[in-house]
Design a protein with these regions (language model features):
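Tetratricopeptide repeat
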Residues: 43, 49-50, 83-90, 113, ...
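Conserved alpha-helical positions within TPR/SEL1-like repeat arrays
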Residues: 25-36, 61-76, 101-116, 144-159, ...
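Eukaryotic all-alpha helical interaction scaffolds
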Residues: 34, 51-54, 74, 94, ...
Length: 797
């Protein structure tokens, strides 16, 4: 009887388990259907019931996927704390049950929530952990998990402005033929955003439309909202078709509201408001933008908050509410700065401001119209909008410098000339130790053309350059006060002005180089760096120079797209330089010009470092800009000193680094940062100043100019004054080398106004030694005589 009863109980239990399993399966199906339809609250309810059923059955891996569905639904509803809680609980279950597949998915989803909240460092950390874990997943799922993670990384880098890194990931994903429709659609959307930013809106629109069709046929409501929004963005911001843009945003808004997708609703309102603003419908635009701001604040969407505030500011400015516009712009910048401060690595910050510089520009241009102009505030804003990542490397714990702090560092003979450029207009600030002035002008096509023509002319030997230099000088130097006691210019360029050799501009019938020493700065923040004053003299046995020249060639250079000619004058250049400096020299030529010798610490404690080698400025990936050195250990493979490695050098005691190579001042221009080139890396590594080149110059005149430069340095001139003297020697030579092509491309970045230690000549040392020896001998003789005078004399007894 007992056995029969036990059997009955087992059968009943099995039947109950089967019923519970069937119920859980049905709930999972209902959850998936509700998610696809955008019925997120229903999806959460079904997933919670499925989770309870799976927990009763002891199926923790399945329960983790129920929690994942709860997290996804809450993400669409912009309930980010609830989403994070669900994903974290799911991750705990995954790790308990040993589900690598589930854990990697959860890490990606936690990263996605952090991405939506604008917490990009945290998002990157989650994605990278997921990427590292993929090899622990079953072989059958690795490809899918890698696609998911790579797609998220691409979207993150795209958001941060690192378009080239994003394109690398998208290129990798595009070759995958196993994508599901929703995955393919998401890739199309992301690639479309990149093409739009790279200036190809037609291709972007085609990609968005293809994505919208894929999302629609696969029933992916959130993806379809994204596709319609991006279609509207192209019509509004690129093509200028406001009617089609508004139609697309209306569709996105209707779909978002039908599924309670609050993030989608905020974004549709935001971009519809921008479309309306662009066609002058200020009242309607203001309402949409305020509604977008309210929705973004309510859901914690920081990216949408600053964009809405920026749009509100532009609406207010258009309706003459200048105070309201200023308040909105300042609030938008506050949001941007809060996100930037959360980016914990330099790599993430590098291009973060690229698509946000417009907000700073709007506030600068608005405030520049005030009378009197608030110069101190404008200076702070301009510095805040430029070279921020470089400033972080220079002073990790400091804000952008104040006008007063910079003025306190300026000598009486120096002007700081700081430029700011935008689509609306340009500004020039000239600042001395006791004065500051500003001049503004609307953007003018004639001035921009004159500057472009000048840069083109001076970079071509034999061209007639004076007229172009006059026109560009009027565009860039108009209004510069006449002060005969000022002999040194510190220039902080902006944007493409970074490629203008100001010394070759003409003012009052003379070239700038005939009137001023000139140095360039990435930011005025460099002037606030604490540095000890150099000694006036140094001993001749102390090392003055470490130099690398004419490295032994490698068998092939796979990174280079053009042949590298020999440098027959590099050896002569370095030996002549060493002779002009007169102190000790550590010279590495041919096979000895190796990277290992540049990294072993020998650069740390010398005044001068010199490279007479080939160098390449990589405008696609600045960190891969490189100085070519000899193959290591007598091999045949090329060796490079990369830009990213230069940042890590310790050059705090180096007064001057010279890169006597082609185009070492070129580089990628990043909005909000400037030119990512060698000079910035050298200054951030601690060097006081750097000499680099804007274009290719023939080997022989390059060697001669360097000799003239170091001749002046060796006789006590400051780097800025020495470079000016070398350029004037060329300019007044009555030879073909008088053309700016041969001398204007050499630029000094850094302060460069302080004279460097002069070497005490060996003759003086010898004379001093002789004098000291004579003094010693006299002292000895005097001592002997004194001792003799104290001896008792013997007398006859």
């Amino acid at each position: 009887m007992t056995a029969i009863l036990l059997l009955a109980l087992q059968l009943a239990s099995a039947q109950g388990a089967t019923d519970e399993t069937s119920r859980a399966r049905a709930l999972v199906t209902a959850t998936d259907a509700a998610l696809a339809r955008g019925q997120y609250d229903d999806a959460i309810k079904n997933a919670e019931d499925a989770f309870a059923a799976h927990e009763r059955l002891g199926r923790h891996a399945e329960a983790a996927w129920d929690l994942n569905a709860i997290g996804v639904a809450n993400s669409y509803l912009a309930r980010y704390p609830s989403a994070l809680d669900a994903f974290r609980r799911a991750l705990d279950l995954d790790r308990t049950s040993g589900s690598a597949d589930g854990a990697i998915t959860r890490l990606n989803n936690i990263g996605n929530v952090r991405f939506m909240q604008g917490q990009y460092s945290d998002a990157l950390q989650q994605y990278q952990e997921a990427l590292r874990s993929i090899d622990t997943a079953p072989a059958a799922t690795r490809q899918r998990l890698h696609k998911m993670t790579a797609s998220n990384l691409a979207a993150l880098y795209q958001r941060l402005g690192a378009d080239e890194r994003a394109l690398d990931y998208y290129g990798e994903l595009s070759s995958d033929r196993t994508m599901q429709p929703a995955e393919e659609a998401q890739l199309l959307v992301n690639r479309g955003a990149l093409y739009r930013r790279l200036g190809d809106p037609i291709t972007a629109l085609e990609l968005y439309r293809s994505a919208q069709r894929l999302y629609s046929t696969s029933g992916h409501r959130d993806g379809e909202i994204s596709a319609w929004r991006n279609i509207g963005i192209v019509y509004a911001l690129e093509i200028g078709d406001a009617d089609r843009a508004v139609d697309a945003f209306d569709t996105a808004l209707r779909l978002a509201r039908a599924s309670s997708n609050r993030r989608g609703e905020a974004q549709a309102l935001l971009y519809r408001g921008e479309a309306l603003r662009r066609v002058g419908r200020s009242a309607d635009a203001g309402r949409d933008l305020q509604a977008a701001l309210d929705a973004a604040v309510g859901t914690g969407l920081v990216e949408e908050q600053w964009k809405a505030l920026y749009g509100i500011g532009r609406v207010r400015e258009a309706t003459a509410d200048r105070q309201g516009a200023r308040a909105a712009y300042e609030a938008a910048i506050g949001k941007i700065e809060s996100v930037r401060s959360d980016l914990r690595t330099i790599a993430l910050r590098a291009e973060f401001l690229a698509d946000k510089r417009d907000v700073y520009d709007a506030l600068i241009w608005l405030r520049a119209a005030e009378r009197p102009a608030p110069i101190a505030d404008l200076f702070r804003l301009i510095e805040q909008s430029r070279a921020r990542t470089w400033q972080d490397r220079l002073h990790a714990d400091r804000a952008s410098p104040s006008l007063a702090a910079v003025q306190a560092k300026l000598p009486a003979n120096t002007w700081l000339l700081e430029y700011w450029t935008s689509a609306a207009g340009v500004a020039r600030l000239w600042i001395s130790h006791d004065d500051a002035r500003i001049a503004t002008a609307p953007a003018q096509a004639d001035a921009e053309t004159a500057i472009r023509d000048f840069v083109d002319v001076v970079a071509r030997a034999g061209s007639d350059w004076q007229l172009a230099a006059d026109a560009a000088g009027r565009a860039l130097l108009a209004g510069l006060p006449d002060a005969s006691d000022v002999t040194h210019l510190l220039i902080v360029p902006d944007g493409t002005l970074s490629f203008v050799p100001f010394e070759a501009l003409r003012m009052a019938d003379a070239a700038v180089v005939e009137r001023f020493d000139v140095s360039y700065l990435p930011s005025a923040a460099l002037l606030t760096r604490d540095r000890a004053a150099p000694s006036r003299w140094t001993w001749p046995w102390r090392r003055q120079l470490v130099a690398f020249g004419d490295p032994a060639p490698a068998r092939a250079y796979p990174l280079e797209t053009r042949p590298l000619p020999p440098l027959p004058y590099a050896n002569e250049e370095i030996h002549r330089i060493a002779g002009e400096l007169r102190g000790g020299a550590d010279i590495h030529l041919g096979p000895d010009a190796r990277k290992a010798l540049a990294l072993d610490g020998r650069l740390r404690a010398v005044p001068f470092v010199h490279f007479a080698t080939h160098a390449v400025a990589d405008t696609r990936d600045p960190e891969r800009s490189r100085i070519l050195l000899a193959p290591r250990d007598g091999g045949t493979q090329p060796d490079y000193l990369f830009l990213r490695e230069i940042y890590d050098l310790d050059l705090r005691d180096v007064a001057l680094v010279t890169l006597s190579a082609c185009e070492t001042e070129r580089g990628k221009i990043v909005r909000g940062e400037g030119v990512e080139g060698f000079s910035r890396a050298l200054l951030a590594a601690g060097a006081s100043a750097a000499v680099t080149t804007m274009w290719d110059v023939a080997d022989r005149p390059a060697a001669e100019l360097m000799t003239q430069f170091y001749y002046a340095l060796g006789r006590g001139a400051s780097p800025a004054a020495a470079l000016r003297q070398a350029k004037l020697t060329f300019l007044h030579s009555q030879l073909p080398w008088a053309h700016p092509y041969f001398w204007a491309g050499y630029v000094l970045t850094g302060d460069g106004s302080v004279a460097l230690p002069r070497v005490v000549p060996w003759g003086v040392v010898a004379a001093g030694a002789v004098m000291m020896l004579a003094v010693v001998m006299v002292s000895i003789r005097a001592g002997v005589s004194a001792k003799r005078s104290t001896f008792p004399r013997r007398t006859a007894g």
